[in-house]
């Protein structure tokens, strides 16, 4: 059984929830179109331990026992970084989650100003990438488009990695 956990910000736990729904055999769910029949069969070997939406620095630091860098931008109570720091923070989140829950695959996501970042950490490798959509959390420019693209890209990459490393 392959165990998975996510700590997500800009993707609002949708990567983890979608993986859970596919693994649990839900008949219909929002991003089902990303899964082939073969993918859905493989997902029977996956268990989601946790899928979290964690927008705040204090939430990430306390839940994952990690220290995050200072935000690049002031934004209400949530964290807002530049794309460069988003890449660092997504990696820190995935590492903290993997250490805390001892899962096979951990996923972290965060986005402030830029394309955001997603990190998928497996037992053997780290995959760090951005969405394809530039957005600005401070002005709300393109944030819904970036979110959808990040969810889709995160799920697609998860499936590629799952097949490459575990099946």
Swiss-Prot record:
It comes from the Archaea. Pfam families: HcgF. Belongs to the UPF0254 family. This is UPF0254 protein MJ1251. It comes from Methanocaldococcus jannaschii (strain ATCC 43067 / DSM 2661 / JAL-1 / JCM 10045 / NBRC 100440) (Methanococcus jannaschii).
């Amino acid at each position: 059984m392959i165990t998975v956990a996510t700590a997500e910000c800009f993707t609002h736990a949708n990567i983890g929830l979608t993986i859970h729904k596919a693994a649990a055999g839900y008949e219909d769910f929002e991003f089902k179109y990303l899964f082939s029949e073969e993918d859905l069969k493989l997902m029977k070997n996956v268990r989601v331990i946790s899928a979290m939406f964690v927008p705040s620095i204090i939430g990430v630091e306390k839940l994952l026992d990690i220290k995050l860098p200072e935000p690049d931008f002031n934004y209400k109570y949530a964290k807002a970084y530049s794309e460069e720091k988003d890449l660092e923070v997504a990696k820190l989140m995935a590492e903290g989650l993997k250490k805390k829950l001892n899962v096979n695959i951990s996923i972290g996501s965060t986005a402030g100003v830029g394309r955001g970042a997603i990190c998928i950490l497996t037992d053997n490798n780290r995959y760090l990438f951005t969405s394809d959509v530039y957005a600005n959390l401070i002005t709300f420019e393109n944030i819904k488009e970036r979110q959808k693209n990040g969810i889709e890209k995160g799920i697609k990459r998860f499936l590629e990695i799952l097949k490459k490393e575990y099946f």
